[in-house]
Swiss-Prot record:
The modification N6-acetyllysine is found at K52. Interacts with BRDT. In vitro, self-associates and binds SRSF1/SFRS1 (ASF/SF2), SNRNP70 and U2AF1 but not U2AF2. Binds SREK1/SFRS12. Interacts with CCNL1 and CCNL2. Interacts with SCAF11. Interacts with ZRSR2/U2AF1-RS2. Interacts with CCDC55 (via C-terminus). One of its GO terms (molecular function) is RNA binding. Its main location: nucleus. SMART domains: RRM, RRM_1. Extensively phosphorylated on serine residues in the RS domain. Phosphorylated by SRPK2 and this causes its redistribution from the nuclear speckle to nucleoplasm and controls cell fate decision in response to cisplatin treatment. KAT5/TIP60 inhibits its phosphorylation by preventing SRPK2 nuclear translocation. Residues 117-171, 179-189 have a biased composition (Basic residues). The modification Phosphoserine is found at S2, S26, S189, S191, S204, S206, S208, S212, S220. This is Serine/arginine-rich splicing factor 2. GO terms for biological process: mRNA processing; regulation of alternative mRNA splicing, via spliceosome; RNA splicing. The gene is SRSF2. Belongs to the splicing factor SR family.
Length: 221
């Protein structure tokens, strides 16, 4: 197959995609192998634009669909140049050659003049900047809210600790006053009641010894 001529007309042909090719496999080798199963219309091996080396797969076109199916059944899993081939029906048509792409600029995918990528790049930058700003604002807000919540929790914990200490001091003072009142009541209950003057005189009279008859006579005389 010569690369100088334009590609043949492949309309109405059935294409097979052959994967896992080596770099040294040529279109002539593929044609000789696949012509055993029917009339081959075209063999195309895509190559790198700069190195001109094979990209590792090829397209084989048959004029008859039945011949293509027979070749697929026979060559799928076969070994060629030390590689196990994978053959399947091609889903897309033949890709454009490199010399066709050099003639004109690539088709425009976006509307407007010039290239769409350049016109969209500042918009993307603006969007990315706005997104980064919104993210930084949201992060600063979240940090501010976190600091607020932390300060609130700290103030609450301090107030609760103060109230607890006040309660503890009040309970201690009340317990001390109660213990003092109890000790006073106990001391009062233990001390004997005061004795009146009359009771003391009567007691002293009753305690004095009885007089003898001689003393009584002397008193009477």
């Amino acid at each position: 197959m010569s690369y100088g001529r334009p590609p043949p007309d492949v309309e109405g042909m059935t294409s097979l995609k052959v994967d896992n090719l080596t770099y040294r496999t040529s279109p002539d080798t593929l044609r000789r192998v696949f012509e055993k199963y029917g009339r081959v219309g075209d063999v195309y091996i895509p190559r790198d634009r700069y190195t001109k080396e094979s990209r590792g797969f090829a397209f084989v076109r048959f004029h008859d669909k039945r011949d293509a199916e027979d070749a697929m059944d026979a060559m799928d899993g076969a070994v060629l140049d030390g590689r196990e081939l994978r053959v399947q029906m091609a889903r897309y048509g033949r890709p454009p050659d490199s010399h066709h792409s050099r003639r004109g600029p690539p088709p425009r995918r976006y509307g407007g003049g010039g290239y769409g990528r350049r016109s969209r790049s500042p918009r993307r930058r603006r969007r990315s900047r706005s997104r980064s700003r919104s993210r930084s604002r949201s992060r600063s807000r979240s940090r501010y809210s976190r600091s607020k919540s932390r300060s609130r929790t700290r103030s609450r914990s301090r107030s609760t600790s103060k109230s607890r200490s006040a309660r503890r001091s009040k309970s201690k003072s009340s317990s001390v006053s109660r213990s003092r009142s109890r000790s006073r009541s106990r001391s009062r209950s233990r001390s004997p009641p005061p004795v009146s003057k009359r009771e003391s005189k009567s007691r002293s009279r009753s305690k004095s010894p009885p007089k003898s008859p001689e003393e009584e006579g002397a008193v009477s005389s």
